[in-house]
Amino acid sequence: GPAIGFLQEMLRWWDYWLKDIDTGIMKEPMLRAYMQQDVPGSSWYADCPGRWVGEMQWPSSRISAKKFYLGDVGLSLTPTRDVVRVAVTPQTLGLAGGEWCPYGTGGEGPEFPGDQRFDDGASICFDGSPLRSDLEILGATKVTLDLSVDRPTAFVCVRLNDGKPDGSSTRVAYAVMNLTHRIGHHKVQNLIPGRRYRVKFQLSDAAYSFIRGHRLRVAISTTYWPMIWPSPEPVELTLHTKNSSIELPVRPSRGGPKIKPFLAAEEGPPMPTTVLSNEPSKNVVSHDVLSGRVEVFTQRGADGLVIEEHGLEVGGRATTERMSITEG
Protein backbone atom coordinates (compact mmCIF):
# COMPACT_ATOMS: atom_id res chain seq x y z
CA GLY A 1 0.00 0.00 0.00
CA PRO A 2 0.96 3.69 -0.01
CA ALA A 3 3.37 5.23 2.49
CA ILE A 4 1.70 6.59 5.65
CA GLY A 5 2.77 8.72 8.58
CA PHE A 6 3.64 5.70 10.72
CA LEU A 7 5.86 7.66 13.09
CA GLN A 8 3.04 10.10 13.81
CA GLU A 9 0.67 7.21 14.52
CA MET A 10 3.16 5.68 16.95
CA LEU A 11 3.56 9.04 18.68
CA ARG A 12 -0.22 9.32 19.14
CA TRP A 13 -0.33 5.80 20.58
CA TRP A 14 2.50 6.25 23.08
CA ASP A 15 1.40 9.75 24.08
CA TYR A 16 -1.93 8.22 25.13
CA TRP A 17 -0.50 5.25 27.03
CA LEU A 18 2.63 6.81 28.53
CA LYS A 19 1.68 10.47 29.00
CA ASP A 20 -2.11 10.25 29.46
CA ILE A 21 -2.61 12.63 26.55
CA ASP A 22 -5.96 12.18 24.84
CA THR A 23 -4.87 11.99 21.21
CA GLY A 24 -8.15 10.45 20.02
CA ILE A 25 -6.39 7.22 19.08
CA MET A 26 -8.73 5.06 21.19
CA LYS A 27 -11.82 6.44 19.47
CA GLU A 28 -10.63 5.18 16.12
CA PRO A 29 -11.09 1.69 14.64
CA MET A 30 -9.36 -1.15 16.46
CA LEU A 31 -8.27 -2.55 13.10
CA ARG A 32 -7.20 -0.64 10.02
CA ALA A 33 -6.25 -2.60 6.93
CA TYR A 34 -5.30 -1.79 3.37
CA MET A 35 -7.90 -3.42 1.12
CA GLN A 36 -6.10 -4.33 -2.09
CA GLN A 37 -8.10 -4.45 -5.31
CA ASP A 38 -7.33 -5.89 -8.74
CA VAL A 39 -3.63 -6.30 -7.97
CA PRO A 40 -1.60 -7.71 -10.88
CA GLY A 41 0.47 -10.81 -10.21
CA SER A 42 4.01 -9.45 -10.09
CA SER A 43 7.28 -10.28 -8.32
CA TRP A 44 7.85 -6.56 -7.62
CA TYR A 45 5.54 -3.63 -6.85
CA ALA A 46 6.08 0.08 -6.59
CA ASP A 47 2.57 0.32 -5.15
CA CYS A 48 -0.65 -1.70 -5.02
CA PRO A 49 -4.12 -0.32 -5.82
CA GLY A 50 -6.62 -0.27 -2.98
CA ARG A 51 -7.99 1.75 -0.07
CA TRP A 52 -7.88 1.87 3.72
CA VAL A 53 -10.75 0.27 5.65
CA GLY A 54 -11.43 -0.10 9.36
CA GLU A 55 -13.35 -2.15 11.92
CA MET A 56 -14.22 -0.78 15.35
CA GLN A 57 -13.81 -4.24 16.92
CA TRP A 58 -11.78 -7.27 15.94
CA PRO A 59 -12.95 -9.91 15.42
CA SER A 60 -15.71 -7.92 13.78
CA SER A 61 -19.39 -8.81 13.79
CA ARG A 62 -19.55 -7.29 10.30
CA ILE A 63 -17.51 -10.17 8.86
CA SER A 64 -19.66 -13.07 7.69
CA ALA A 65 -18.61 -16.54 6.55
CA LYS A 66 -19.46 -17.47 2.98
CA LYS A 67 -18.89 -21.10 2.09
CA PHE A 68 -18.01 -22.38 -1.37
CA TYR A 69 -17.98 -26.09 -2.08
CA LEU A 70 -15.46 -27.75 -4.36
CA GLY A 71 -17.41 -29.54 -7.06
CA ASP A 72 -17.39 -31.15 -10.44
CA VAL A 73 -17.81 -27.82 -12.23
CA GLY A 74 -15.71 -25.63 -9.94
CA LEU A 75 -16.87 -23.65 -6.91
CA SER A 76 -20.53 -23.60 -5.94
CA LEU A 77 -22.64 -22.32 -3.05
CA THR A 78 -24.29 -25.73 -2.57
CA PRO A 79 -22.74 -29.21 -2.36
CA THR A 80 -22.60 -31.17 -5.60
CA ARG A 81 -22.14 -34.86 -6.31
CA ASP A 82 -18.92 -36.36 -5.04
CA VAL A 83 -16.16 -36.23 -7.63
CA VAL A 84 -12.69 -37.68 -7.20
CA ARG A 85 -9.80 -35.48 -8.35
CA VAL A 86 -6.25 -36.80 -8.33
CA ALA A 87 -3.14 -34.64 -8.04
CA VAL A 88 0.46 -35.65 -8.70
CA THR A 89 1.95 -32.21 -9.14
CA PRO A 90 5.41 -31.49 -10.59
CA GLN A 91 8.27 -31.06 -8.16
CA THR A 92 8.91 -27.62 -9.66
CA LEU A 93 5.43 -26.28 -8.94
CA GLY A 94 5.81 -23.14 -6.84
CA LEU A 95 8.30 -21.17 -8.91
CA ALA A 96 5.82 -18.28 -8.95
CA GLY A 97 5.39 -18.40 -5.17
CA GLY A 98 7.85 -15.67 -4.25
CA GLU A 99 9.72 -15.54 -0.95
CA TRP A 100 8.20 -16.90 2.25
CA CYS A 101 9.54 -13.82 4.04
CA PRO A 102 10.55 -11.09 1.58
CA TYR A 103 14.02 -9.79 2.39
CA GLY A 104 13.51 -6.33 0.94
CA THR A 105 10.02 -5.55 2.19
CA GLY A 106 10.30 -2.11 0.65
CA GLY A 107 10.15 -3.65 -2.80
CA GLU A 108 13.90 -3.84 -3.32
CA GLY A 109 13.85 -6.98 -5.44
CA PRO A 110 11.70 -9.59 -7.21
CA GLU A 111 10.41 -11.30 -4.05
CA PHE A 112 6.62 -11.40 -4.28
CA PRO A 113 4.35 -14.03 -5.90
CA GLY A 114 4.13 -13.48 -9.64
CA ASP A 115 1.47 -14.44 -12.16
CA GLN A 116 0.06 -17.73 -10.91
CA ARG A 117 -1.25 -19.13 -14.19
CA PHE A 118 1.69 -21.52 -14.73
CA ASP A 119 1.44 -22.97 -11.21
CA ASP A 120 -2.34 -23.08 -11.62
CA GLY A 121 -1.96 -25.10 -14.80
CA ALA A 122 -0.20 -27.90 -12.91
CA SER A 123 -2.60 -27.85 -9.93
CA ILE A 124 -6.10 -29.08 -9.26
CA CYS A 125 -8.14 -25.90 -9.77
CA PHE A 126 -11.71 -25.03 -8.85
CA ASP A 127 -13.01 -21.81 -10.40
CA GLY A 128 -16.14 -19.93 -9.46
CA SER A 129 -18.46 -18.25 -11.92
CA PRO A 130 -17.62 -14.67 -12.92
CA LEU A 131 -18.59 -12.45 -9.99
CA ARG A 132 -21.71 -10.35 -10.52
CA SER A 133 -20.52 -7.77 -8.00
CA ASP A 134 -17.39 -6.96 -6.03
CA LEU A 135 -16.57 -9.37 -3.20
CA GLU A 136 -14.35 -8.25 -0.30
CA ILE A 137 -12.63 -10.48 2.22
CA LEU A 138 -10.92 -9.48 5.45
CA GLY A 139 -9.31 -12.13 7.61
CA ALA A 140 -8.40 -15.78 7.17
CA THR A 141 -10.07 -18.16 4.73
CA LYS A 142 -10.89 -21.56 6.25
CA VAL A 143 -10.28 -24.75 4.27
CA THR A 144 -11.78 -28.22 4.69
CA LEU A 145 -10.43 -31.05 2.53
CA ASP A 146 -11.55 -34.69 2.34
CA LEU A 147 -8.48 -36.46 1.02
CA SER A 148 -6.21 -39.47 0.98
CA VAL A 149 -2.59 -39.94 -0.10
CA ASP A 150 -0.45 -42.89 -1.13
CA ARG A 151 2.54 -42.10 1.09
CA PRO A 152 2.99 -41.83 4.89
CA THR A 153 4.26 -38.24 4.61
CA ALA A 154 2.81 -35.57 2.35
CA PHE A 155 2.12 -31.87 1.94
CA VAL A 156 -0.92 -30.11 0.58
CA CYS A 157 -0.73 -26.52 -0.62
CA VAL A 158 -3.90 -24.48 -1.11
CA ARG A 159 -3.92 -21.10 -2.85
CA LEU A 160 -6.81 -18.66 -3.16
CA ASN A 161 -6.31 -16.71 -6.37
CA ASP A 162 -7.93 -13.86 -8.27
CA GLY A 163 -8.65 -15.29 -11.72
CA LYS A 164 -8.89 -12.44 -14.20
CA PRO A 165 -10.66 -12.19 -17.57
CA ASP A 166 -7.33 -11.89 -19.42
CA GLY A 167 -6.21 -15.28 -18.05
CA SER A 168 -3.74 -13.96 -15.48
CA SER A 169 -3.94 -15.03 -11.86
CA THR A 170 -2.94 -13.26 -8.62
CA ARG A 171 -2.31 -15.09 -5.37
CA VAL A 172 -4.45 -13.59 -2.60
CA ALA A 173 -3.88 -16.05 0.25
CA TYR A 174 -2.30 -19.45 0.71
CA ALA A 175 -1.12 -22.07 3.19
CA VAL A 176 0.97 -25.22 3.12
CA MET A 177 -0.08 -28.03 5.43
CA ASN A 178 2.32 -30.79 6.42
CA LEU A 179 -0.25 -33.55 6.70
CA THR A 180 1.73 -35.35 9.38
CA HIS A 181 0.91 -32.27 11.53
CA ARG A 182 -2.85 -32.47 10.81
CA ILE A 183 -3.64 -33.02 14.51
CA GLY A 184 -1.27 -30.26 15.62
CA HIS A 185 2.41 -29.42 15.78
CA HIS A 186 2.51 -31.07 19.20
CA LYS A 187 1.61 -34.49 17.75
CA VAL A 188 3.30 -35.51 14.52
CA GLN A 189 1.67 -38.61 13.07
CA ASN A 190 2.31 -40.37 9.77
CA LEU A 191 -0.57 -40.98 7.43
CA ILE A 192 -1.92 -44.41 6.52
CA PRO A 193 -1.78 -44.64 2.71
CA GLY A 194 -5.24 -44.91 1.21
CA ARG A 195 -7.11 -43.81 4.36
CA ARG A 196 -9.38 -40.80 3.99
CA TYR A 197 -8.81 -37.83 6.28
CA ARG A 198 -10.79 -34.65 6.78
CA VAL A 199 -8.25 -31.89 7.18
CA LYS A 200 -9.04 -28.35 8.33
CA PHE A 201 -6.73 -25.34 8.35
CA GLN A 202 -6.61 -21.61 7.59
CA LEU A 203 -5.00 -19.68 4.78
CA SER A 204 -2.95 -16.55 5.41
CA ASP A 205 -4.90 -13.45 6.40
CA ALA A 206 -5.87 -11.16 3.55
CA ALA A 207 -7.67 -7.91 2.83
CA TYR A 208 -8.66 -8.12 -0.82
CA SER A 209 -11.46 -7.02 -3.12
CA PHE A 210 -12.33 -9.38 -5.97
CA ILE A 211 -13.97 -7.16 -8.56
CA ARG A 212 -16.96 -7.85 -10.75
CA GLY A 213 -16.21 -10.16 -13.67
CA HIS A 214 -13.27 -11.86 -11.96
CA ARG A 215 -13.37 -15.43 -10.64
CA LEU A 216 -12.44 -16.99 -7.33
CA ARG A 217 -9.94 -19.79 -7.88
CA VAL A 218 -8.83 -22.47 -5.45
CA ALA A 219 -5.62 -24.22 -6.56
CA ILE A 220 -4.43 -27.37 -4.77
CA SER A 221 -1.04 -29.05 -5.12
CA THR A 222 1.21 -31.51 -3.29
CA THR A 223 4.37 -29.48 -3.96
CA TYR A 224 5.43 -25.85 -3.57
CA TRP A 225 9.14 -25.65 -4.33
CA PRO A 226 11.43 -23.94 -3.48
CA MET A 227 9.42 -22.53 -0.58
CA ILE A 228 9.11 -26.00 0.94
CA TRP A 229 11.35 -29.04 0.70
CA PRO A 230 9.93 -31.88 -1.42
CA SER A 231 8.40 -34.95 0.21
CA PRO A 232 10.72 -37.99 0.49
CA GLU A 233 8.77 -39.62 -2.34
CA PRO A 234 6.40 -38.23 -4.99
CA VAL A 235 2.86 -38.10 -3.60
CA GLU A 236 -0.45 -38.90 -5.24
CA LEU A 237 -3.28 -37.05 -3.53
CA THR A 238 -6.91 -38.07 -4.01
CA LEU A 239 -9.46 -35.36 -3.23
CA HIS A 240 -13.16 -36.06 -2.62
CA THR A 241 -15.05 -32.91 -3.48
CA LYS A 242 -18.42 -33.39 -1.75
CA ASN A 243 -17.03 -32.75 1.73
CA SER A 244 -14.37 -30.25 0.64
CA SER A 245 -14.95 -26.51 0.89
CA ILE A 246 -13.54 -23.07 1.59
CA GLU A 247 -15.10 -20.45 3.86
CA LEU A 248 -14.38 -16.83 3.01
CA PRO A 249 -14.42 -14.00 5.60
CA VAL A 250 -16.66 -11.64 3.63
CA ARG A 251 -16.75 -7.96 4.55
CA PRO A 252 -19.49 -5.61 3.29
CA SER A 253 -17.93 -3.09 0.95
CA ARG A 254 -20.17 -0.30 2.22
CA GLY A 255 -20.72 1.02 5.69
CA GLY A 256 -18.26 0.70 8.52
CA PRO A 257 -16.40 3.46 10.33
CA LYS A 258 -14.92 6.41 8.55
CA ILE A 259 -11.15 6.31 8.32
CA LYS A 260 -9.25 9.39 9.38
CA PRO A 261 -6.69 10.07 6.65
CA PHE A 262 -3.13 9.26 7.60
CA LEU A 263 -0.62 12.06 7.64
CA ALA A 264 2.16 12.07 5.08
CA ALA A 265 5.18 9.92 5.85
CA GLU A 266 7.95 11.75 7.69
CA GLU A 267 11.56 10.99 8.46
CA GLY A 268 14.51 12.83 9.92
CA PRO A 269 16.94 14.67 7.66
CA PRO A 270 19.44 12.23 6.13
CA MET A 271 23.08 12.36 7.17
CA PRO A 272 25.67 12.97 4.45
CA THR A 273 26.85 9.60 3.15
CA THR A 274 28.98 8.12 0.42
CA VAL A 275 27.54 5.11 -1.39
CA LEU A 276 30.00 2.23 -1.71
CA SER A 277 27.78 -0.20 -3.57
CA ASN A 278 24.22 -0.41 -4.76
CA GLU A 279 23.89 -3.74 -6.53
CA PRO A 280 20.41 -4.82 -7.64
CA SER A 281 18.70 -7.93 -6.32
CA LYS A 282 17.67 -10.57 -8.82
CA ASN A 283 16.00 -13.93 -9.14
CA VAL A 284 16.87 -16.13 -12.14
CA VAL A 285 15.23 -19.45 -13.02
CA SER A 286 16.94 -21.77 -15.51
CA HIS A 287 15.62 -25.05 -16.93
CA ASP A 288 17.74 -27.78 -18.50
CA VAL A 289 15.20 -29.29 -20.86
CA LEU A 290 17.23 -32.46 -21.48
CA SER A 291 17.83 -33.45 -17.85
CA GLY A 292 14.75 -31.77 -16.40
CA ARG A 293 16.88 -29.93 -13.85
CA VAL A 294 15.58 -26.56 -12.69
CA GLU A 295 17.81 -24.10 -10.85
CA VAL A 296 16.83 -20.97 -8.95
CA PHE A 297 19.56 -18.38 -8.45
CA THR A 298 18.79 -15.55 -6.02
CA GLN A 299 21.05 -12.59 -5.30
CA ARG A 300 20.50 -10.03 -2.55
CA GLY A 301 22.23 -6.90 -3.72
CA ALA A 302 24.90 -5.15 -1.66
CA ASP A 303 23.98 -1.72 -0.25
CA GLY A 304 27.07 -0.43 1.56
CA LEU A 305 27.65 3.23 2.46
CA VAL A 306 29.89 5.38 4.67
CA ILE A 307 28.51 7.97 7.11
CA GLU A 308 30.77 10.92 6.38
CA GLU A 309 30.56 12.53 9.84
CA HIS A 310 32.51 9.76 11.56
CA GLY A 311 33.48 7.31 8.80
CA LEU A 312 31.34 4.38 9.98
CA GLU A 313 30.71 1.89 7.18
CA VAL A 314 27.26 0.29 7.23
CA GLY A 315 25.26 -1.92 4.93
CA GLY A 316 25.20 -5.48 3.76
CA ARG A 317 27.26 -7.60 1.44
CA ALA A 318 25.74 -9.30 -1.56
CA THR A 319 24.50 -12.80 -0.74
CA THR A 320 23.55 -15.53 -3.17
CA GLU A 321 21.47 -18.71 -3.04
CA ARG A 322 21.36 -21.58 -5.52
CA MET A 323 18.66 -24.20 -5.32
CA SER A 324 18.05 -26.94 -7.84
CA ILE A 325 15.72 -29.88 -8.31
CA THR A 326 15.27 -32.53 -10.97
CA GLU A 327 11.87 -33.98 -11.81
CA GLY A 328 11.63 -37.67 -11.01
Predicted segments with their positions:
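C-terminal, loop-rich substrate-recognition/catalytic regions characterized by aromatic stacking residues
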Residues: 2-328
